[in-house]
């Protein structure tokens, strides 16, 4: 078990790093001046006025590729969490993980590239035509991208179910750090702010667009801390 904990601890750290790199890509998209007319993924004033920096898409791509490569360690850690006798649950996590690693990076780059095209085309074609063109392209391609979201849901919900039903070696209280909990909290903060009458801010877009990767990073770091404490307790014994 000690050797498994060392591997698990390392995998969780690498997984957290991978999620952090993916989050950098989310920041490339969301850390821009907010306008009260901003909405959705691409109807952002900073995109439409051509001020979105040319360096952002290459950075999003580079960090995304590295982050998805490190996603291998995330999936292996989630697989290792589940006790060996629960083979079907392990298989579900593995299948969802393979789909996630193979396809989530494509979605990441698709969103980034459409933001970049919005930035490039708006000064040439005008706002209304650019918005219509980009939205049509997004609606045309996203149905094909649903396979990525299917993989993500299988991993996230399957892992949450395994933790709650004690199919993992983790204590049940660890669910408070789970991706489901963190992501829901991050997503509802902008909604709560707007319900209270606050103006739209850059932070609203950061929290909503980066919630998934931030939540994964929190979950991986929480698991790394737990595994490290277990190792220390084993050394004391």
Where are these regions (language model features)?
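Hydrophobic, aromatic-enriched alpha-helical segments typical of multi-pass transmembrane helices
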Residues: 2-236
